[in-house]
Amino acid sequence: MAHYRASVEEAEALVLELLRQHGASSASAASVARALVEAQLQGKPNVGLAHLPAYLDSLKEGRADGQSEPVLETPAPAVLRVDARQNFPQLAFDLACDAFVSAAQNCGIAVLSICNGYTSGELGYYVRRLTDHGLVGLGMTNAGPALMAASGGTTPVFCTNPLAFAVPRKSGPPLVIDQSSSATALVKILKAAESGEAIPEGWALDSNGKPTRDPKEALRGVFLAFGGQRGANLALMVELLAAGVTGANWSVDAPAFNKGERCPGTGVLLIALQPDLLLGADFDERCEAYLTRLAEDHHAHLPGIQRGLQAQERRERGIEVPSELWQRLQELRDLKDEYDLSKLKKQPNPYVSRLK
């Protein structure tokens, strides 16, 4: 596959312009552009530039309100909440970030809830941002409409309900864990459906509640949690925190994020921890020594670190974007005020909720 190498500045400028053309405010567009390019830098293209058409569609069709201004409230010194007002969670996070970080640094721990937003994109982005300030971050979201069954069930009640966790390091990129509660991410089943490949057993059930290895049947049916009941328990925990505590839509009530005019209204819950206030100033040294021991003595994989190193390299030499996608985005920009996505060849949307 041919690729175009774009600088970070070039990619952000293109994404920013497209979002503004489709009705997003400058602030909203800037927040989303930064997040999508960061995902691309991290080697997660399906929630990077390939995800941009879903955002543009959402603006054009009314699922996201790119002009609304999120509302930030601070009901307690270390508790912040933002009503995204059907705008993007990335903007809501940027609005609250400085106060959120300050609260965690002063109080030792702080909580930020975001509700009434469009889908959050790459969850690891939010917790990585916290490590820039020396904070440990934990995040979760009920990312959209129901796709996954509860333990023992055959009907969808949860979305993929990811969790993300990040720890800063004294030197080098942070350790980052970012994974769904489902047996696999939605994008993997979509890729299999596009290529015609079978999926492993244990990933999904068909529309009749039977195990399936057919990815298209999986998309018509229901996803399964990883690890059976244990994964389903985590999905339930995420649902109760990311939707229940924030006041967002439950996944079973969330509208689709790829069709219709209603915002999914999902929620994000983030927790920031200042470790030095609990342990003292030697947390960095203690943590780095432990991670080095795991890697060197036990050959353990340390998630997120290699991605972070690769992101630094890409930031210097440029981001590789499939040429077809880059050309399509350029063509869409040249349409300017026409906003007609139907004039372009559609790429499979990595965030569809069902194949009809």
Describe every region a protein language model picked out.
Residues 147-216:
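Phosphate/diphosphate-binding glycine-rich loops and adjacent basic-rich segments that engage nucleotide
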